[in-house]
């Protein structure tokens, strides 16, 4: 099976990636005769020690704010630690920023099995993703920004020398990237080494944010990587580049006009730099069962411009009650993602719907016609391998809508890892669920709102001009995407674009 390289940018993204890699760590054979039942090389790179043992490391590049690595020193497992005992306190520099390791990490360093992880880990001692990370990263995989600190709040970083400047909008991220070009060569080299370690590259996963400057930074970084290693353009690459954009409303729960415009710009630019774009927080490993085509081909159905997967749901399974696709058990309630991923908690639906909706909600005011009806272009299900009986109950088909069903033996295993806070599902570790990823016309409502906002905004500040850059081009980009989420017989409420 082909390898996957992961790029993770931001503290939130790194929380998500850590759960992925902790799940991968649980598959590593630590005993000589232990059977290997997983393709560990997909997400992990391997190297042999002089004693013949195999080391596993994440096949990833991680980016964070300054001090975002928490208690982790990127070189500590690869160099002899410095002894500060004989250095006078007055000569020690910046040690006030040193963060002590929690008990869980201390146990890992000592080789003590953390059988009591549930009682050791808490919201209070897992502020950083490194507080419960279980794998050792290569130093070249860990990158921190030059000018922005993590600060007291995980939502936005602050400039190291000018704390009033926040790491909150698209153009700020672009500027930070351009100011850090001295690091670009090493980042390109690190990415190249990851690619060279692959025998058959399957694709690149990118986890970033929609609501901070990480969107601009990610766009600039991807532009360099794609130009250098993917034949000069996203349309020319034979590899998949899937981007997962983390959405939140910011510290106050409300967005300023600059932040709203920044979110629009980020969404459009990240979608342009991807072969599939998911405004969600995770992606289960999947294997097709009904088609020899790739997952990407199945979802796109030939419409490669309709790449934004806008409808995401997580549904519980109660096999004893399954009779059709709409009777799949009770609601997943009391979900508190924010406590563990530092994300906004999704709102559970009413008890009759049987799911929570992880789709990105409409984020700007909209004007919609009462005649508008939501229609699905394609529906996609990822089900647990052991739930094969679900296919006997129903074929996951919905009134002629093109549907794809994928099996994954990993989709429920993640909640069995000792670092996963399974109690957010108000359930035990044997909790079963499947996921649904759909593409529908509903996204055009959001796109129309984006277009209206950009058309009507006045470029009366340097910051807005920096975010939008070329207003006409941004409107054209939105219109281009909008075409592919609109059905031909839909009543048109479009206005002329001549007035921008």
Swiss-Prot record:
Keywords, comma-separated and alphabetical: Mitochondrion
Pfam families according to UniProt: Misat_Tub_SegII (PF10644), Tubulin_3 (PF14881)
Chief site of localization: mitochondrion
Compartments (UniProt record): Mitochondrion
GO biological process per UniProt: mitochondrion organization
The keyword Methyltransferase belongs to this UniProt entry's keyword annotation: no
Cellular component GO terms, alphabetical: mitochondrion
General function of this protein: Involved in the partitioning of the mitochondrial organelle and mitochondrial DNA (mtDNA) inheritance.
Family label: Belongs to the misato family.
Protein name from the UniProt record: Protein DML1
Organism annotation: Scheffersomyces stipitis (strain ATCC 58785 / CBS 6054 / NBRC 10063 / NRRL Y-11545) (Yeast)
């Amino acid at each position: 099976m082909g390898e996957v390289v992961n790029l993770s940018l931001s503290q939130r993204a790194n929380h998500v990636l850590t759960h992925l890699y902790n799940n991968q760590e649980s598959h590593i054979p630590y005993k000589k005769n232990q059977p290997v039942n997983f393709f560990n090389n997909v997400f992990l790179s391997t190297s042999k020690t002089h004693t013949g043992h195999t080391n596993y490391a994440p096949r990833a590049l991680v980016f964070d704010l300054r001090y975002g690595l928490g208690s982790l020193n990127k070189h500590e497992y690869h160099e002899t630690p410095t002894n500060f005992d004989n250095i006078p306190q007055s000569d020690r520099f910046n040690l006030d920023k040193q963060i002590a390791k929690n008990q869980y990490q201390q146990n890992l360093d000592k080789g003590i099995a953390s059988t009591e992880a549930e009682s050791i880990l808490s919201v209070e001692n897992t502020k950083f993703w490194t507080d419960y990370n279980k794998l050792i990263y290569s130093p070249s995989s860990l990158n921190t920004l030059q000018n922005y600190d993590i600060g007291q709040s995980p939502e936005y970083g602050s400039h190291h020398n000018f704390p009033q400047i926040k790491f909150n909008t698209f153009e700020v991220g672009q500027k930070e990237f351009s100011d850090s070009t001295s690091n670009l060569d090493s980042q390109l080299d690190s990415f190249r080494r990851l690619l060279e370690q692959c025998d058959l590259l399957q694709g690149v996963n990118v986890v970033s944010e929609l609501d901070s400057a990480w969107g601009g930074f990610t766009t600039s970084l991807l532009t360099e990587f794609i130009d250098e290693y993917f034949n000069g353009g996203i349309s020319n690459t034979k590899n998949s580049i899937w981007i997962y954009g983390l959405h939140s409303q910011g510290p106050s729960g409300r967005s300023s006009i600059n932040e709203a415009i920044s979110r629009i710009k980020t969404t459009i630019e990240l979608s342009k730099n991807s072969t599939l774009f998911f405004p969600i927080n995770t992606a289960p490993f999947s294997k097709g069962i009904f088609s020899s085509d790739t997952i990407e081909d199945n979802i796109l159905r030939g419409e490669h411009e309709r790449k934004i997967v806008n409808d995401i749901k997580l549904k519980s399974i109660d096999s004893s009650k399954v009779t059709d696709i709409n009777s799949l058990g009770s609601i997943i309630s009391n979900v508190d993602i924010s406590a563990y991923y530092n994300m906004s908690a999704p709102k559970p639906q009413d008890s009759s719907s049987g799911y929570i909706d992880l789709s990105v909600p409409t984020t700007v005011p909209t004007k919609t016609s009462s005649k508008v009806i939501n229609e699905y272009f394609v529906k996609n299900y990822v089900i647990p391998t052991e739930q094969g009986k679900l296919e006997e109950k129903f074929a996951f088909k919905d009134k002629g809508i093109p549907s794809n069903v994928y099996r994954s033996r990993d989709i429920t295993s993640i909640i069995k890892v000792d670092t996963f806070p399974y109690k957010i599902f108000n359930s035990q570790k044997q909790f079963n669920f499947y996921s649904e990823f759909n593409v529908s016309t509903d996204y055009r409502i959001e796109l129309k709102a984006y277009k209206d906002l950009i058309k009507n905004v006045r470029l009366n500040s340097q910051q807005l001009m920096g975010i939008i850059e070329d207003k006409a081009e941004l409107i054209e980009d939105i219109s281009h995407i909008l075409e592919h989420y609109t059905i031909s017989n839909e009543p048109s409420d479009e206005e002329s674009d001549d007035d921008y």
